[in-house]
Amino acid sequence: MARVTVEDCIDKVDNRFDLVLLAAHRARMISSGSQLTIDRDNDKNPVVALREIADSTISPEDLKEELVHSLQKFVEVDEPEPDTVPLIGSAGASVDADDTEVAVERMTEEELLKGLEGLAPPEEQPEEDE
């Protein structure tokens, strides 16, 4: 059997580095029990993976998808958002009629400062050394 080199596979995957990543991922898949698409012929898993890519029995695009999926730690699921989001306190919400006429009292800065001056400062507590 002739040796499989990167040159045999370079027409299937343009980038040599991508080819190595894909072949290594396929070799790991074979090690974990994935079905072979060609005869083993007493070859090791990386050689079998390269032969599968060279013979086009495995799609490089599918291998790339599987590689990306295996490296993801969190898979984000896109859910359609509703067209309109109900606002809090909108007219459509169940609000009592009495709540709509609440008057908010405004304070000036001077009134706020006077109110703060009237507050008692917190008592100082002695620090305990442990």
UniProtKB/Swiss-Prot annotation:
Q: Which UniProt keywords apply?
A: DNA-directed RNA polymerase, Nucleotidyltransferase, Transcription, Transferase
Q: Which InterPro entries match?
A: DNA-dir_RNA_pol_omega, Pol_omega/Rpo6/RPB6, RPB6/omega-like_sf
Renumbered residue ranges of the record's region Disordered? 110-130
Q: Which domain of life is it from?
A: Bacteria
Q: Does the keyword ATP-binding apply?
A: no
Q: What is this protein called?
A: DNA-directed RNA polymerase subunit omega
- Reactions accelerated catalytically: RNA(n) + a ribonucleoside 5'-triphosphate = RNA(n+1) + diphosphate
Q: Which HAMAP family match?
A: RNApol_bact_RpoZ
Query: Cross-referenced Pfam families, in alphabetical order?
Result: RNA_pol_Rpb6
Family to which this protein belongs: Belongs to the RNA polymerase subunit omega family.
**What does the subunit section of this Swiss-Prot or TrEMBL entry state?**
The RNAP catalytic core consists of 2 alpha, 1 beta, 1 beta' and 1 omega subunit. When a sigma factor is associated with the core the holoenzyme is formed, which can initiate transcription.
Task: Please report the organism this UniProt entry assigns to the protein.
Answer: Bradyrhizobium sp. (strain ORS 278)
Cellular component GO terms, alphabetical: DNA-directed RNA polymerase complex
Q: Say yes or no: keyword Chaperone present.
A: no
List, in alphabetical order, the Gene Ontology terms for molecular function in this entry: DNA binding; DNA-directed RNA polymerase activity
Function of the molecule: Promotes RNA polymerase assembly. Latches the N- and C-terminal regions of the beta' subunit thereby facilitating its interaction with the beta and alpha subunits.
NCBIfam families (UniProt xref): rpoZ (TIGR00690)
